[in-house]
Regions:
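Active-site loop segments of alpha/beta catalytic cores
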Residues: 1-182
Length: 182
């Protein structure tokens, strides 16, 4: 919702939070509309052959745990509830979510995406080992020398503890200038 409300990216999400706090009825009406549209879009992606879908929320980490619970979580639950019988893995990802990882689990998804700001083993304990996790290499590590990349990869794999259910991935999107060889 923030991109629509702000008109693009934002450093402080002033207009988004202003709407949440000063006009919660309009906020929830907008979020309900987004939830229904997103659910329909992801369902159509699945019908077209997608073998997994991901709900990617790149600004959710700017919310407090209380604000997430009140203003966002109910709408995210609607999305995952609307897709849970589609027969494909549902991935739930946000950045800066250490404080709300348990709530992300409660909101839904078969796989919880983990960014790079927390050790994988700590995050997985918070999420619960009955859920798969995806992540959590810092995308900027790909600009480091290969020996540093290997060291970071090995640390993440060690923290995964050979448990099933870890999808190794970046903890956010890859940058266009990332060296192809890395």
């Amino acid at each position: 919702a923030s991109y629509a409300i702000e008109g693009g990216g934002s450093r402080n999400y002033l207009h988004t939070k202003q709407m949440m706090y000063s006009d919660p009825a309009s906020w929830h009406k907008l979020m309900d509309k987004f939830a229904r549209v997103i659910t329909g879009y992801l369902r159509r992606q699945i019908q077209a052959g997608a073998q997994a879908v991901q709900l990617f929320d790149s600004w959710v980490g700017c919310l407090s745990a209380g604000d997430y619970a009140e203003y966002v979580k109910p709408h995210v639950q609607l999305i995952f509830d609307g897709l849970k019988h589609e027969g494909v893995p549902l991935i739930h990802f946000g950045t800066g979510t250490t404080a709300i990882l348990r709530q992300l689990r409660e909101a839904g998804g078969d796989v919880i995406g983990i960014d790079w700001r927390i050790h994988l083993d700590e995050a997985w304990t918070m999420v619960g080992h009955d859920r798969a996790v995806q992540g959590n290499l810092d995308p900027l590590v790909l600009f480091a020398p290969l020996h540093e990349i290997e060291r970071r990869v090995e640390d993440i794999l060690r923290r995964a503890g050979n448990r099933p259910g870890h999808i190794f991935n970046l903890g956010h999107g890859i940058l266009p200038t990332t060296p192809v060889d890395h």
